[in-house]
């Protein structure tokens, strides 16, 4: 990121609510770009959540040694957990896909599955439709 962004986030004179707003409007959209199409694994969501919390702690001026709860930091900055936003984005995209006509290219790429394709050994990869079904539960 540009040094000017870090200057805003590190400056102690900038109110924390404003830092949270800045985070929600610039940094989080960059992290979530294209996330509606990802069939994410728990490990990926966990890694991104850890990176997000590290950044939020840094914005507040706290470290892990300060033993401040994650929920308290999120409340101070007015930020919701990454996983909730990821589910929102995925379900919003699912609504767009559902409203498209059946001959639209998005239907052939996402919702159709080739049953005659041989899959490799091991656990089958999570598909986008399976991720949506998990979000709807």
Predicted regions span which residues?
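Short linear motifs embedded in intrinsically disordered, charge-biased segments
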Residues: 1-137
